[in-house]
């Protein structure tokens, strides 16, 4: 079991190398034969296919098999589907004598089944000649489904012929495609398309998700991803997950364990004081949403500070949340010296501070943010214009700050912080690199959102919904994060929990509404509902 509570409670997402290590541990140290693993994997995939598309009795299924163990999994799937009554046509993309040992064994089992007459004429096995011949062969079958078992996690270079043509061919079919482990042509670590890649409707992945299914082109190429239990012990997967490049992903179970509980004798100051600093004309709504999100996440006492020019707006919108006006200067931004004095008592008594929603980019405001970061010893969340104020100064501020901090950039903000070096071709590595460099928890928002800690611990958000593609959801996320930190969650767990709960709230909205109609304030109504339904019975684990 990994030392971090985030790692222990969130399941692993593995690289190809880590998955190979898990196979090796299971076979050599745990004593489970490779053939048994293949059988369990194929049987599990066949069951998932039946669950999604069945019953497949008398339906035609075309199984495309490569020469490696991915192809062997496909041969096991073919055997189980045909014995369950499907009409199965197996296409071998290589000569039988080129198959891996376990795949060759499974081909012999299929041929024996065919020879025994046990499945009648429902099983046919052929070698690929060309796609024109294949088209003619499968057209009379009217396939219900295609299974991609051509290439698995070992692929690192562009797909070559004849598999390249097969990928293009299967992508042109109208029936759905199920990929085994990863879609052929997808890099299992980066999600990059290696020349061509299968566009699957579903992917049955073995033992644990692969990183490439979650990043890059993975989500659009893999479709719905289901994890198939192949009999690997959990401790084997945890051990493999310690390999470089592996991450974890959020789950309801993890958030339930982290979710703050209240003692019967709790009072407002005992369950977290959060301070939100934000707002500037015309963005007064941003700190309002953040402050409300902090309260909806359970912080007992929330205060909101903003420029005096919008104080009346903040006070009118936040009838249950005290507001604090900050002096402004000649540039219409916050006056640094006077504002720091005005904020001192609130900052000293807060358990966590959020800086940035709607704050604006006036020079005085940016100077105020940088001085606040240098001086306060309260945990910080920096978002939006709070991040923009750090651009060009973040490396020195990382050394000068007094408290832990969470940075919540979207792609544009991240590039401004990281400069020309901040390429996002590999989102996970980028978040990890700069979290370590800035000694921060970096919540890099996007697809997927990545939470990386300064020691390398990394958690992906596991809920993605287009409902979140609307203005203001980042303000709500930042407010959730500071609210959870104020209640005692570690910065990494607070960021991961906020990400998961916000996604669950958007998902909940989309279950009863058109996701395109959601606005950020709808999340404020959904967060307490989702918390009660899915997380509220948990115990706090900081």
From Swiss-Prot:
Binding-site list for (6S)-NADPHX 1: 181
Annotated spans, NAD(P)H-hydrate epimerase: 1-243
Catalytic activity, EC: 4.2.1.136, 5.1.99.6
Entry keyword set: ATP-binding, Isomerase, Lyase, Metal-binding, Multifunctional enzyme, NAD, NADP, Nucleotide-binding, Potassium
Residues engaged in binding (6S)-NADPHX 2: 358, 475
Residue sites binding K(+) per the record: 70, 148, 184
Residues annotated as domain YjeF C-terminal: 251-534
GO molecular function annotations of the record: ADP-dependent NAD(P)H-hydrate dehydratase activity; ATP binding; metal ion binding; NAD(P)HX epimerase activity
Record note on cofactor: Binds 1 potassium ion per subunit.
Pfam family name, one: Carb_kinase
Residue ranges, annotated region (ADP-dependent (S)-NAD(P)H-hydrate dehydratase): 251-542
Keyword Nucleotide-binding: yes
Amino acids binding ADP: 445-449, 465-474
Entry keyword annotation includes Cytoplasm: no
GO biological process terms held by the UniProt record: metabolite repair; nicotinamide nucleotide metabolic process
Similarity annotation: In the N-terminal section; belongs to the NnrE/AIBP family.
Role of this protein: Bifunctional enzyme that catalyzes the epimerization of the S- and R-forms of NAD(P)HX and the dehydration of the S-form of NAD(P)HX at the expense of ADP, which is converted to AMP. This allows the repair of both epimers of NAD(P)HX, a damaged form of NAD(P)H that is a result of enzymatic or heat-dependent hydration.
Protein name: Bifunctional NAD(P)H-hydrate repair enzyme Nnr
Source organism (scientific name): Salinibacter ruber (strain DSM 13855 / M31)
């Amino acid at each position: 079991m990994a030392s971090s509570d985030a790692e222990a409670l969130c399941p692993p997402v593995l690289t190809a190398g880590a998955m190979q290590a898990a196979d090796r541990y299971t076979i050599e140290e745990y004593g489970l034969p490779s053939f048994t693993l293949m059988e369990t994997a194929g049987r599990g995939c066949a069951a998932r296919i039946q669950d999604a598309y069945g019953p497949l009795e008398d339906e035609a299924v075309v199984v495309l098999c490569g020469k490696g163990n991915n192809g062997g999994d496909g041969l096991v799937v073919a055997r189980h589907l045909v014995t369950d009554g499907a009409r199965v046509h197996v296409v071998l993309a290589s000569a039988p004598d080129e198959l891996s040992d376990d795949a060759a064994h499974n081909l012999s089992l299929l041929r024996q089944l065919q020879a025994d007459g046990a499945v009648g004429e429902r099983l046919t096995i052929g070698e690929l000649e060309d796609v024109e011949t294949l088209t003619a062969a499968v057209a009379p079958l009217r396939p219900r489904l295609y299974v991609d078992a051509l290439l698995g996690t070992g692929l690192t270079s562009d797909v070559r012929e004849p598999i390249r043509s097969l990928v293009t061919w299967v992508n042109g079919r109208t029936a759905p495609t199920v990929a085994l482990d990863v879609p052929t042509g997808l890099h299992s670590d980066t999600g990059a398309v290696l020349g061509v890649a299968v566009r699957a409707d579903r992917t049955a992945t073995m033992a644990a998700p692969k990183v490439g299914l979650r990043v890059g082109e993975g989500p659009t190429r893999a479709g719905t991803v289901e994890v198939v239990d192949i009999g690997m012990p959990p401790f084997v997967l945890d051990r493999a997950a310690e390999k470089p490049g592996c991450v974890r992903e959020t789950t309801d179970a993890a958030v339930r364990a982290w979710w703050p509980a209240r003692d019967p004798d709790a009072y407002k100051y005992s369950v977290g004081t959060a301070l939100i600093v934000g707002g500037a004309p015309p963005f007064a709504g941003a700190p309002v949403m953040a402050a409300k999100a902090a309260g909806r996440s359970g912080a007992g006492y929330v205060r909101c500070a903003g420029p005096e020019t919008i104080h009346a707006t903040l006070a009118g919108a936040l009838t249950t949340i005290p507001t604090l006006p900050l002096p402004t200067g000649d540039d219409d931004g916050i006056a640094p010296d006077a504002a720091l004095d005005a904020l001192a008592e609130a900052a000293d008594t807060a358990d966590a501070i959020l800086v940035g929603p709607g704050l604006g980019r006036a020079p005085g405001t940016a100077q105020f943010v940088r001085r606040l970061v240098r001086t306060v010893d309260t945990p910080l969340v920096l978002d939006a214009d709070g991040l923009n104020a750090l651009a060009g100064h973040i490396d020195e501020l990382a050394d000068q700050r007094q408290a832990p901090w969470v940075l919540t950039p979207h792609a544009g903000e991240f590039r401004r912080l990281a400069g020309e070096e901040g390429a996002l071709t590999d989102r996970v590595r980028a978040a990890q690199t700069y979290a370590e460099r800035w000694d921060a928890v970096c919540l890099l928002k996007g697809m997927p959102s990545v939470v990386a800690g300064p020691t390398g611990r990394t958690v992906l958000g596991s809920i993605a919904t287009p409902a979140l593609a609307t203005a203001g959801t980042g303000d709500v996320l930042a407010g959730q994060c500071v609210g959870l930190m104020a209640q005692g969650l570690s910065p990494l767990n607070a960021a991961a929990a906020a990400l998961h709960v916000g996604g669950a709230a958007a998902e909940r909205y989309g279950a009863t509404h058109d996701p395109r109609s959601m606005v950020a304030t709808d999340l404020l109504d959904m967060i307490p509902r989702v918390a009660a339904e899915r997380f509220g019975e948990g115990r706090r684990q900081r």
